[in-house]
């Protein structure tokens, strides 16, 4: 299925950076990773660095699915606020999830610094109240984060307008966030993976998965066989095709990017990404070359033709919302696009085996607005499971939480 509409900026900016060979003959490996986006790349890189043998199989070109349509906001702030997550799983679990996401940003920073070329940029994150009635819960969210040592402060209405150009009654300012070019990150990771000995194949679709002991047999649509000791399904929202019941719902999100702006026009966006308490939320961030990326207006459409038809009307709505909240921001879109993604009921990901496919097949479902951050956590979690070592998030980020 086509995962995106319009012209995602990252694929236009970077082009097709590298073609990998199709898988054309039977192969045997320790770990087969199905998927070729940034989630698969982070997992492959983690496994290879720790001595595992990896084959990567992607049905499209590498990075050409949801990765190319991502706006790549790297936040510890989960789509579900900490106080709401605590109601579902308890405050200890909520704090564990938020803390792991905070550490993941630092881990991603270290990783990107080792090979460069990803446009990784540390930023602040401004989470502002969409309506006056949101202030009470936003204050409670601030106190919950402070209690667990997260770097946050409160911004009142006047300094919010004076320093950030945002009309709102209050906001949480977080000092730990970042942005990245997801497409470049994906390719840089896979380039590193090749140096560790990975075999990477694109334009190769998997038609069947047959778990056995002590291996798993995969078969491509062209009839080529792959026998692996372990399989990791990291194919984005398409992972759900392998389960009889969905564990997440598919949605579409809409975004645009401007031409480069002068520094004087960028204002606080140069160093601060901004998003709101409303759901679905509006978000705005900058790129290192002075562009503004904005998006939101999520809906339940995942039929490509219907999603395609909505891109321009969603663009107009996004511009109207930005104009209302940030009236000094004059934005002229250069490209607009939409992408299909999935989200879970509690905003948390799923990493690990599912009873339907047994212990040798693991899922990597980094769903929600924290996809790249979740993937960085999931890479370590899946390695721990592969090596039969405990991980503090195996339960919370596993299918067992579904009951």
Where on the chain are the PLM-derived regions?
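Extreme N-terminal leader/targeting segments of oxidoreductases
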Residues: 1-31
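Flavin (FAD/FMN) cofactor-binding and adjacent substrate-gating region
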Residues: 2-13, 80-85, 110-188
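N-terminal Rossmann-like FAD-binding beta1-loop-alpha1 element of flavoenzymes
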Residues: 29-56
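Glycine-rich FAD pyrophosphate-binding loop
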Residues: 49-69
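Glycine-rich active-site loop/strand segments that organize a redox cofactor
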Residues: 69-100
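Helical element adjacent to the flavin cofactor pocket in flavoenzyme catalytic cores
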Residues: 144, 171-222, 226-229
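Flavin-dependent oxidoreductases
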Residues: 208-287
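C-terminal catalytic lobe of FAD-dependent flavoproteins
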Residues: 308, 323-403
